[in-house]
Swiss-Prot record:
The lineage of its organism: Eukaryota, Metazoa, Chordata, Craniata, Vertebrata. This is Laminin subunit gamma-2. Binds heparin. Residues 28-83, 84-130, 139-186, 187-196, 382-415, 416-462, 463-517, 518-573, 574-603 form the Laminin EGF-like domain. The gene is LAMC2. GO terms for cellular component: basement membrane; extracellular region. Pfam families: EGF_laminin, Laminin_B. GO terms for biological process: animal organ morphogenesis; axon guidance; cell adhesion; tissue development.
């Protein structure tokens, strides 16, 4: 009865406040995580709301289910709390932050604290440690062979790598390479051998197309294979192709990139590419390789990204079948090697969409060739089995033939089946006759299990092999050796077990036991030899810290699972303290056996007789709680016996509850303090990161300033070096001129007749040298004044930023420097003009010399006249170039005047404030660049004058050389005159004959032009029809997506692009006309030196062509009309049905949209209904029955 009264009293005490609160505004606030709550009087006193939530959902906790339970986290307030899953050994506690990251122990990393940091190993309850006693703890791994960090103290090797340090290739692989995802390359050997190594006879060879002179054999084709226009840029030294339509155009590689490219396996194919205009979305067929009936493709970049517009970027593709190389479809290893062995096509996409232009340059394929040079270790050298030979086992050995000739080197080699064991052709299998093999004696045809007796080849002897195995005789020792022993068996008589196997196949040491693989539980190195005893099978070279007959136990001082598949999970060091633990061993779970007086996970702590002083307060509090608990237990026992009044028991329980509340409140205060401290730490870290970013920005700014300064110094050094080279060239020219003997300008009077002319040329050369020195000095002074000008501008900026105006003295000084710079520029102009005048005088002297030579008595050689005319034209060209550069220099001089005006304007604006000072700095930089430009143009003018002087000197030498030829020509003058007269007659005849031929050619040309115009109109008509189809299709799509506005804008952009392209084409045509005109002039200059005999041959050829006049190609016109008819037929038969189908699809799509709208309306009505139900629910739900049962 008292117990019942207590329970009812508690229920009444809990329900009455709830009833009182129900009349106010207080309700259960559980953040949507609970439907149950209870009233707490103390909580009501503290917060004014006494409802405490019960049974919080979604792993939440707290008075209002406002936080996650210990060991759970969430990123946002309303999210479900997710488990932290912190590793119990590697984390400091089960808690984690809002992103799910746990707090790790020393040496541990990872979001879950489940991995060791690099250089650490053995994750235990104390964290990860580095055991100095173990050699493996150094993690001395070969970086080319590892696939991840060394967490367990042992190197984690790539799939094709082995060894304790991951420094060796597995059997069947070779060439350890850090760039290979597998680590090593699988032996190819055409599938005939699994043993190979890197060849030392090959060196690196790069197959390159850099397009320095022409297209280098490359072509451009449409997707259907039809040819497209490919152009070479002389300026940029690259090739490009354009497309007006959306069909892609591809660059096609020449023959040097095709054929047998086996030695390029695993290497890279790279090229520089950029696209201008058009679409810029990559496709799966951007790069295409074809060969041996196979075809693979790859995109330039991930399909989710966009190609950069107008930016040249290098794209690299690795030639292997690994998924990271992005080739599709993914071939097998041998399929990829078969493709490279007979590569028939390499295509790279050029255009993307309409009006697109693609540029490509520096196409490079890494290959190898058998010459000396940088080694190419990726080329293999195979160890061929019996019946094969060659570096790659690609040939059949003597006495063997192809099982299938159509497979080529991939086919299997089998023994020849010839009478008497004769040899045969390795490809066809045809047996050689006896006279073709005189060294092979006639032998008996022995069956399997027998061999020819070396002493008597006509007789057969049984093989000394059991089970009827075949055998052969070694030619060197005549020893009989058994062939084709079964797997796992070896020896001359197949009497031994092979490496990695054990047993006794003949029972020579006991009962017969067939050879079987050693059972070492994957705890031996498969690339090592002698892993087990060949007779007993006992494992001899256990690794991973294992031991035992079958490597199935951990070594002393280690624990774990020796049969685990992951090496990191196998046997690990016990890590016991040698002082506090029993002999260095541990239990199966890694726990150490401690000596008396020691404790801890590794027995590293000595036992303590009492707790530290910092625990005294806690101990006192715990003792008080224990006393109260004992009193409560006594009261409860008495209450059950009926000897203690319930009021006393109730009071004691309230005291206990109060004590518990105090503890909870103190814990909450501590938790709040920790949370506040964490927020302060986070804020400090944020500020630290901000400061670090600002510091990095400052460092980058300093580096950029240093780089600009270094670049400027390099430019100054280059200018000085060029001036020095020009001075040396002038000195060398002067020395050459002094050592040159020049013939006389008048009639020939002797070897010293041109002495005065040589002295005049020497004087001119000296004056040129002096002019160059003056120009150099003026250029240096201009550069120094430019530097001073920049420093003054910077001072003006600094003063303007501080006081808002410039000092008057600084302004005056700046103007003075400007005037002095202007005067130096004018003086530089005068020097250049004087140099031009001297060069012109030299030119006039040369013309006078030419006229004098042409007046030599008795000389009338036409070839000499032609040569003199060519040299005169060359001199005129050089003079024109000098005039042109003088005009450019005057233009630069006029720019200097503009610079003066702009600088004065900058000075005036600098007085108005800081913003105007910034403008002054920018324009001063512009002035500096123009001054440098003037200096470079002056240097260029000096360079041109030097070349003119050099050419004039060469001209004098050439005239002297022609003197001997002129004397020889005088002897042949009469004969040449006769030939010239005959040639003149024939020329007149040819001109008469050419009159009618020219008219016929003009008519043929007009007819061809009309045919081209007709074909152009046909193409325009077809394009118009296609455009109408596209407009119809776009109209159908516009009905669904509402893209009419975007479409019009795109048309405007396309029109603008078309106009730009037309302007570009016009510019290109003008450039081509200039180039063609220059080419024609050059050709005429070259043809001037052709002999009379060549002229006669040309006339004979012209007369022969006149006898075979051309005609208009009417068949081409008929063919064009037929194509037009077929195009119209195709439009009526295919395009119109397609338009109807698109209209039908649009109609169906509209119906589907109407159905979706109806469904959405229904769903919205259901949602509205649910909201009404939610609004009518009561604010709280109180389970009084559940309270009664507590």
């Amino acid at each position: 009865m008292p117990a019942l009264w207590l329970r009812c009293g508690l229920c009444l005490a809990l329900l009455l406040p709830a009833a009182r609160a129900s009349s106010g505004s207080q309700v259960c606030d559980c953040n949507g995580k609970s439907r149950q709550c209870i009233f707490d009087q103390e909580l009501h006193k503290q917060t004014g709301n006494g409802f405490r939530c019960l049974n919080c959902n979604d792993n939440t906790d707290g008075i209002h289910c406002e936080r996650c339970k210990a060991g759970f986290y969430r990123q946002r307030e309303r999210d479900r709390c997710l488990p932290c899953n912190c590793n119990s050994k590697g984390s400091l506690s089960a808690r984690c932050d809002n992103s799910g990251r746990c707090s790790c122990k020393p040496g541990v990393t990872g979001d879950r604290c489940d991995r060791c940091l690099p250089g650490f190993h053995t994750l235990t309850d104390a964290g990860c440690a580095q055991d100095q006693r173990l050699l493996d703890s150094k993690c001395d791994c070969d970086p080319a062979g590892i696939s991840g960090p060394c967490d367990s103290g042992r190197c984690v090797c790539k799939p094709a790598v082995t060894g304790e340090r991951c420094d060796r290739c597995r059997p069947g692989y070779y060439h350890l390479d850090g760039g290979n995802p597998q680590g090593c390359t699988q032996c190819f050997c055409y599938g005939h051998s699994a043993s190979c190594h890197s060849s030392g006879d090959y060196s690196v060879h790069k197959i390159i197309s850099a397009f320095h002179q022409d297209v280098d054999g490359w072509k451009a084709v449409q997707r259907n294979g039809s040819p497209a226009k490919l152009q070479w840029s002389q300026r940029h030294r690259d090739i490009f192709s354009s497309a007006r339509r959306s069909d892609p155009v591809y660059f096609v590689a020449p023959a040097k990139f095709l054929g047998n490219q086996q030695v390029s396996y695993g290497q890279s194919l790279s090229f520089d590419y950029r696209v201008d205009r058009g679409g810029r979305h990559p496709s799966a067929h951007d790069v295409i390789l074809e060969g041996a009936g196979l075809r693979i493709t790859a995109p330039l970049m991930p399909l989710s990204k966009t190609l950069p517009c107008g930016i040249t970027k290098t794209y690299t593709f690795r030639l292997n079948e690994h998924p990271s190389s992005n080739w599709s479809p993914q071939l097998s290893y041998f399929e990829y090697r078969r493709l490279l062995r007979n590569l028939t096509a390499l295509r790279i996409r050029a255009t993307y969409g309409e009006y697109s232009t693609g540029y490509i340059d520096n196409v490079t394929l890494i290959s190898a060739r058998p010459v000396s040079g940088a080694p190419a270790p990726w080329v293999e050298q195979c160890v061929c089995p019996v019946g094969y030979k060659g570096q790659f086992c690609q040939d059949c050995a003597s006495g063997y033939k192809r099982d299938s000739a159509r497979l080529g080197p991939f086919g299997t080699c089998i023994p020849c089946n010839c009478q008497g064991g004769g040899a045969c052709d390795p490809d066809t299998g045809d047996c050689y006759s006896g006279d073709e093999n005189p060294d092979i004696p006639e032998c008996a045809d022995c069956p399997i299990g027998f061999y020819n007796d070396p002493q008597d080849p006509r007789s057969c002897k049984p093989c000394p092999c059991r089970n009827g195995f075949s055998c052969s005789v070694m030619p060197e020792t005549e020893e009989v050796v058994c062939n084709n022993c079964p797997q796992g068996v070896t020896g001359a008589r197949c009497e031994l077990c092979a490496d990695g196997y054990f047993g006794d196949p003949f029972g020579e040491r006991g009962p017969v036991r067939p050879c079987q693989p050693c059972q070492c539980n994957n705890n031996v190195d498969p690339s090592a030899s002698g892993n087990c005893d060949r007779l007993t099978g006992r494992c001899l070279k256990c690794i991973h810290n294992t031991a035992g007959v079958h490597c199935d136990q951990c070594k002393a001082g280690y624990y774990g699972d020796p049969l685990a598949p992951n090496p990191a999970d196998k046997c690990r060091a016990c890590n016991c303290n040698p002082v506090g633990s029993e002999p260095v061993e541990c239990r199966s779970d890694g726990s150490c056996v401690c000596k008396p007086g020691f404790g801890g996970l590794s027995c590293e702590h000595a036992a303590l007789t009492s707790c530290p002083a910092c625990y005294n307060q806690v101990k006192v509090q715990m003792d008080q709680f224990m006393q109260q608990l004992q009193i409560l237990e006594a009261l409860i026992s008495k209450a059950q016996g009926g000897a203690v009044p319930n009021a006393e028991l109730e009071g004691r329980m309230q005291q206990a509850e109060q004590a518990l509340r105090d503890i909870l409140r103190e814990a909450q205060i501590s938790q709040d303090a920790v949370r506040s401290f964490n927020l302060r730490v986070a804020k400090a870290r944020t500020q630290e990161n901000s400061y670090r970013d600002r510091l990095d920005d400052l460092k980058m700014t300093v580096e950029r300033v240093r780089a600009l300064g270094s670049q400027y110094q390099n430019q100054v050094q280059d200018t000085r070096r060029l001036i020095t080279q020009m001075r040396l060239s002038l000195e060398e020219s002067e020395a050459s001129l002094q050592n040159t003997n020049i013939p006389p300008s008048e009639h020939y009077v002797g070897p010293n007749g041109f002495k005065s002319l040589a002295q005049e040329a020497t004087r001119l050369a000296d004056s040129h040298v002096q002019s160059a020195s003056n120009m150099e000095q003026l250029a240096k002074e201009t550069q120094e004044y430019s530097k001073e000008l920049m420093s003054l501008v910077r001072e003006a900026l600094q003063e303007g930023g501080g006081s808002g105006s410039l000092d008057g003295a600084v302004v005056q000084r700046l103007v003075g420097k400007l005037q002095k710079t202007k005067s130096l520029a004018q003086e530089l102009s005068r020097e250049a003009t004087q140099t031009d005048m001297e060069a012109d005088r030299s030119y006039q002297h040369s013309l006078h010399l030419l006229n004098s030579v042409s007046q030599i008595q008795g000389v009338n050689d036409q070839s000499l006249q032609v040569e003199a005319k060519r040299l005169r034209q060359k001199a005129d060209s050089l003079s024109n170039r000098v005039t042109k550069h003088m005009d450019e220099f005057k233009h630069v001089q006029s720019n200097l005047g503009n610079w003066e005006e702009e600088t004065r304007q900058l000075l005036q604006n600098g007085k108005n404030g800081r913003q105007t000072s910034d403008q002054l700095l920018s324009r001063a930089n512009l002035a500096k660049s123009r001054a440098q430009e003037a200096l470079s143009m002056g240097n260029a003018t000096f360079y041109e004058v030097e070349n003119i002087l050099k050419n004039l000197r060469e001209f004098d030498l050439q005239v002297g050389d022609k003197r001997a030829e002129a004397e020889e020509a005088m002897k042949r003058l009469s004969y040449i005159s006769q030939k010239v007269a005959g040639a003149s007659d024939k020329t007149k005849q040819a001109e008469a004959a050419l009159g009618s031929a020219a008219a016929d050619a003009q008519r043929a040309k007009n007819a061809a032009r009309e045919a081209l115009e007709i074909s152009g109109k046909i193409e325009q008509e077809i394009g118009g029809l296609n455009l109408e189809a596209n407009v119809t299709a776009d109209g159908a799509l516009a009905m669904e997506k509402g893209l009419a506005t975007l479409k019009s804008e795109m048309r405007e952009v396309e029109g603008e692009l078309s106009r730009k392209e037309q302007e570009f084409d016009m510019d290109m045509d003008a450039v081509q006309m200039v180039i063609a005109e220059a080419q024609r002039v050059e050709n005429r200059a070259k043809n001037a030196g052709v002999t009379i005999q060549d002229t006669l041959n040309t006339l004979d050829g012209i007369l022969h062509l006149i006898d075979q006049p051309g005609s208009v190609d009417e068949e081409r016109l008929i063919l064009l009309e037929q194509k037009l008819f077929r195009a119209k037929t195709q439009i009526n038969s295919q395009l119109r049905p397609l338009m109807s189908e698109l209209e039908e699809r649009a109609h169906r799509q509209k119906g589907h949209l109407r159905f979706l709208e109806t469904s959405i309306d229904g769903i919205l009505a259901d949602v509205k209904n649910l909201e009404n139900i939610r609004d009518n629910l009561p604010p709280g739900c109180y389970n009084t029955q559940a309270l009664e049962q507590q």
